[in-house]
From Swiss-Prot:
<feature type="binding site">
    <location>
        <begin position="122"/>
        <end position="130"/>
    </location>
    <ligand>
        <name>5-phospho-alpha-D-ribose 1-diphosphate</name>
    </ligand>
</feature>
<feature type="binding site">
    <location>
        <position position="134"/>
    </location>
    <ligand>
        <name>5-phospho-alpha-D-ribose 1-diphosphate</name>
    </ligand>
</feature>
<comment type="function">
    <text>Catalyzes the transfer of the phosphoribosyl group of 5-phosphorylribose-1-pyrophosphate (PRPP) to anthranilate to yield N-(5'-phosphoribosyl)-anthranilate (PRA).</text>
</comment>
<keyword id="KW-0460">Magnesium</keyword>
<feature type="binding site">
    <location>
        <position position="240"/>
    </location>
    <ligand>
        <name>Mg(2+) 1</name>
    </ligand>
</feature>
<dbReference type="InterPro" id="IPR017459">
    <property type="entry name" value="Glycosyl_Trfase_fam3_N_dom"/>
</dbReference>
<keyword id="KW-0028">Amino-acid biosynthesis</keyword>
<dbReference type="GO" id="GO:0000287">
    <property type="term" value="F:magnesium ion binding"/>
</dbReference>
<comment type="subunit">
    <text>Homodimer.</text>
</comment>
<dbReference type="Pfam" id="PF02885">
    <property type="entry name" value="Glycos_trans_3N"/>
</dbReference>
<dbReference type="Pfam" id="PF00591">
    <property type="entry name" value="Glycos_transf_3"/>
</dbReference>
<dbReference type="InterPro" id="IPR036320">
    <property type="entry name" value="Glycosyl_Trfase_fam3_N_dom_sf"/>
</dbReference>
<keyword id="KW-0057">Aromatic amino acid biosynthesis</keyword>
<feature type="binding site">
    <location>
        <begin position="97"/>
        <end position="98"/>
    </location>
    <ligand>
        <name>5-phospho-alpha-D-ribose 1-diphosphate</name>
    </ligand>
</feature>
<dbReference type="InterPro" id="IPR035902">
    <property type="entry name" value="Nuc_phospho_transferase"/>
</dbReference>
<comment type="pathway">
    <text>Amino-acid biosynthesis; L-tryptophan biosynthesis; L-tryptophan from chorismate: step 2/5.</text>
</comment>
<feature type="binding site">
    <location>
        <begin position="104"/>
        <end position="107"/>
    </location>
    <ligand>
        <name>5-phospho-alpha-D-ribose 1-diphosphate</name>
    </ligand>
</feature>
Amino acid sequence: MIKKAIAKVVEREDLTESEMIQVMDQVMSGEATPAQIAAFITALRMKGETVAEITGAARVMRDKVTRIRVGKNILDMDRDDINVDLETILDTCGTGGSCTNTFNVSTTVAFVVSACGVKVAKHGNRSVSSACGSADVLESLGVNLDVTQETIERCINEIGIGFLFAPALHGAMKYAIGPRKEIGIRTIFNILGPLTNPAGAGCQVLGVYREDLVEKLAHVLKNLGCKRGFVVHGQDGMDEMTLTAETRIAEVTPAGVATRLFRPEELGLSRCGMDDLRGGDAAANAVIVRRVLEGEKGPKRDIVLLNAAFGLVAAGRVVDPAAGLTMAAEAIDSGKALAQLEKLVKLTNE
C-alpha cells in the first residue's frame, strides 16, 4: 500500500482516511522500509496534509500507544453546575517548533489547571526546536521521567497531574525515528503527538507552530472525538496564546469548530515584548517555572494565566476565560499550583 500511496501523493492527490490508516499501519508495524517512510512523509509534506490524512494517521498512532488508564470523568461535588460531558482529562500539549525560545508555558499551565481541580495528563517530549522541552524542564525541576505506567496512572488519579513522556509510550514510532532525523524537515509526525494522548484526554489546549494548522487540527480533534478544546497560534509565531500579538483560535465544541482572533486586551491583560517571555536551558526554565508558581508577577505569570484560563474553559471548569483567569490566579496565589509540582516530584521519586 505504501508504494501506491507514495505514487499518489507525488502526483498531489489526497489520500482517503482509510488509505492513510493502511499506510501508517505499515509504517508503525515495521513493514515499510526507511526509504519508503522518508519518501512518503516528504511527499506528503510537499503536497500538504489534509484533515482526513492527519485523522487517519492519528487513529493508527492512538491504536498503537501504550495506554494510561485513568478515571473517565472527574466530578467536583462542591460545584452547583457539574457538567459530566465536559469534565474530563485535559492535555496542554503543543506541537513545539515555534522557534521563539520562550519558557515552558504549557508545562507551567498544567500545574495551575490541575490545582483548580482538573485532572491533567500532560503529554510531552524533550526539546524539538527550543533549548528546553517539557520533559527537560520537568526533569530539572526534580520530576522523575523514568517511571512505570502504573506510577503515571497513580499521579493522575491521586494528585491530579501526570507527565506522559512520549518516547516511553509511543513505541511504534521507533520505525520513523531514523528517516525523520535523516531528512531533517518537519513532517506529519511533528503534529501527531498532541493528537495522540496516551490517556485519551477528551479536552485540549493545543498550540501549533503554523497558523494554517489552527483550523485544520481543530477539525481533526473534532473527528477524533474531542469534547471541547482550543487550537491556538500566536501571530508572533508562538505555539501558545500570546501576549505580544493577537492569537488565532479555533474552538472545538459539540456544535462544531469556530475560528477567531483573540486580543489580550479582551481579558484586561497588557501586551509585552517577546524578550519578556524568553527562556533558556532546562535549568534556567526550571527557575522561571518555579518563580511563576511561587507568585512572581509580570508577563510570564500573565501568559500562564491566559493559557490556563482557556484550559479551564476547555475542561468545563469555568464558563468563560474571564472566570478562568480569576480561578488560575487564585490557584497560584494560594500556593496550590506550586504544591502540585511538589506532589508530582515526590510521587515520581518514591
